[in-house]
Structure formats: structure tokens, C-alpha cells
């Protein structure tokens, strides 16, 4: 049993180290670079062919929901989320109150941990991912145990 726990801890430590390394690559990105990256993330799952493949895989793997619902979530929710946040400032000075001599700076936090629910594993990881990357963070998404 303790070997299983040790192996799990080592596995998680490796994931976190790899995620930190990935985050370091984007922590100095400009707003334009961040926005291009999250656009690419959404396109990678919502593009023709891939959205269908993910929807079918989700149905086969979870035996929950229906294909059309999964496909539409990938197509609509990922794009809608992108449109909701694409114009938000997330790099550098994001708010300024000169009369009080206050500036609010956006700064990456690092590695974020998240769960993907078994009922919505097709859109949730990319939506959580674009929110994390918008702040120049990395994310590890784990499936919810079923």
C-alpha cells in the first residue's frame, strides 16, 4: 500500500514539475501572445473533425449523454467562453487609479489543479485551460473518479 502511495506522489510530482516548466515558457508572454495561444487552444478542439472525434470518444468512454449534446458543447461553449474573455486584460497593468496612485498588475500564479467532471469531460478541460492560460498559468486537469 505504501508503495502505491509513493508511486502516486512521484507521478503527481512529475506532473507538477512538467506543468511548471510549461508555465515558465509563457509567463512572460505579451497580451497578444496569450490571446493567440488561447485562440489556438479553442481551435484545436472545436475545429471540424476534432470536435466530432472528441464527442464520440466521450460517449464511448463515459456512456453518459448523447453525441449531439457533446458535440454542441465543444463547438459552442468553448467558442463562447473564448469570446467572453478574449478582450479581457490579463497581462501587465489591468486597472489603474491615478488619483490614488494605485495600479493593479496581473501576475501568473503558476500551476493550477482542476477536476473534469465525468458528466462533462469534453468541454470542461479546455474551458478551464483557457482561463488558466489567459493568466499565463499552467493547469493540470484530472478526471473526476467515477
Positions of the model-derived regions?
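Conserved small-residue-rich beta-alpha loop and adjacent elements
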Residues: 85-146
Amino acid at each position: 500500500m505504501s508503495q502505491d502511495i509513493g508511486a502516486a506522489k512521484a507521478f503527481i510530482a512529475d506532473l507538477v514539475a512538467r506543468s511548471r516548466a510549461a508555465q515558465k515558457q509563457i509567463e512572460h508572454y505579451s497580451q497578444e501572445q496569450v490571446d493567440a495561444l488561447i485562440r489556438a487552444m479553442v481551435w484545436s478542439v472545436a475545429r471540424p473533425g476534432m470536435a466530432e472525434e472528441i464527442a464520440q470518444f466521450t460517449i464511448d468512454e463515459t456512456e453518459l449523454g448523447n453525441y449531439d449534446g457533446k458535440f454542441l458543447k465543444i463547438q459552442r461553449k468553448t467558442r463562447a467562453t473564448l469570446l467572453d474573455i478574449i478582450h479581457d486584460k490579463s497581462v501587465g497593468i489591468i486597472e489603474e487609479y491615478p488619483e490614488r496612485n494605485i495600479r493593479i498588475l496581473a501576475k501568473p500564479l503558476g500551476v493550477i489543479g482542476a477536476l473534469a467532471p465525468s458528466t462533462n469531460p469534453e468541454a470542461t478541460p479546455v474551458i478551464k485551460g483557457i482561463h488558466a492560460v489567459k493568466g499565463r498559468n499552467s493547469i493540470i486537469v484530472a478526471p473526476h473518479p467515477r
